[in-house]
Amino acid sequence: MPKTQTLEQTKLSEPKMYKVILLNDDVTTMDFVIEILMNIFHQNLEKASQTMLEIHHNGSGICGIYTQEIALSKQKKVIDAAKLANFPLQAKVEEE
């Protein structure tokens, strides 16, 4: 008699996603913010300029949406680069 096997379907859920948000300040230059957006978030010049203006006019702006691990890594890269350049630029991570 052949053995029968029951296969259970495992339902995989999508991972939670997190927004990386840059916060405007009165010291960090617009050029530095664009550099961050291009180098860390891989935005082209046009998109980086649009995002920078959003941050400047609204006080903050979303730079990208990632899994938690990647979002936290990008936040750390922003803060480290800003400290190295003597800018107070801050980034925060929020669940979407």
From Swiss-Prot:
Pfam families: ClpS
Protein's gene: clpS
Cystines in this chain: none
Protein's name according to its UniProt entry: ATP-dependent Clp protease adapter protein ClpS
Superkingdom per UniProt: Bacteria
HAMAP family in alphabetical order: ClpS
UniProt function note: Involved in the modulation of the specificity of the ClpAP-mediated ATP-dependent protein degradation.
Subunit structure as annotated in this protein's UniProt entry: Binds to the N-terminal domain of the chaperone ClpA.
GO aspect biological process, one term: protein catabolic process
Protein family (similarity comment): Belongs to the ClpS family.
